[in-house]
């Protein structure tokens, strides 16, 4: 499921004890976006790739792969087996159609962009147990009539 470069990046990140939040401060990009570069779902600029590889102590020759547009959405199998990723699949199974209806009531017939899009993860402290807050913000794209 992970490429050789993903494994190298994750291994170097662990060895250096660097967090995605720290890389966010270094690169000036969101931590989720940086993680998506690690998993080859986003493309870094040459400058971003150089900063990232330098911070991780990796060979700058790897920059070429990080700056090449990747094949996106290549998770396998179709139904994820990782428990955390599966929860998002499960959320869409339960709330996908209701979410679609609410979005279309507010915006009309269309979709939320995953290209003009941001994804943020926050920790919300709660006495009953900390909570994960995921915020998706995508441009609404109305279906064209012709």
UniProtKB/Swiss-Prot annotation:
Catalytic activity, as annotated: cyanate + hydrogencarbonate + 3 H(+) = NH4(+) + 2 CO2
Alphabetic keyword roster: Lyase
Active site: 87, 90, 113
CDD domains the record matches: Cyanase_C, HTH_XRE
Molecular function per GO: cyanate hydratase activity; DNA binding
EC assignment: 4.2.1.104
Domain of life: Bacteria
Key word Zinc present: no
GO biological process: cyanate metabolic process
Function: Catalyzes the reaction of cyanate with bicarbonate to produce ammonia and carbon dioxide.
Assigned protein family: Belongs to the cyanase family.
Protein name: Cyanate hydratase
Origin species: Synechococcus elongatus (strain ATCC 33912 / PCC 7942 / FACHB-805)
């Amino acid at each position: 499921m992970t490429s050789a470069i993903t494994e190298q990046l994750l291994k170097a990140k662990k060895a250096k004890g660097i967090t995605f939040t720290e890389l966010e401060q270094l690169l000036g990009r969101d931590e989720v976006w940086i993680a998506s570069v690690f998993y080859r779902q986003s493309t870094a600029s040459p400058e971003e790739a150089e900063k990232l590889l330098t911070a991780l102590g990796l060979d700058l020759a790897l920059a070429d792969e990080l700056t090449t547009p990747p094949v996106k959405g290549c998770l396998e199998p179709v139904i994820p087996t990782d428990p955390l990723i599966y929860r998002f699949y499960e959320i869409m199974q339960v709330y996908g159609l209701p979410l679609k209806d609410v979005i279309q009531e507010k915006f009309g017939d269309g979709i939320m962009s995953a290209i003009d899009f941001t994804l943020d993860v926050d920790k919300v402290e709660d006495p009953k147990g900390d909570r994960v807050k995921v915020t998706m913000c995508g441009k609404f794209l109305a279906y064209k009539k012709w």
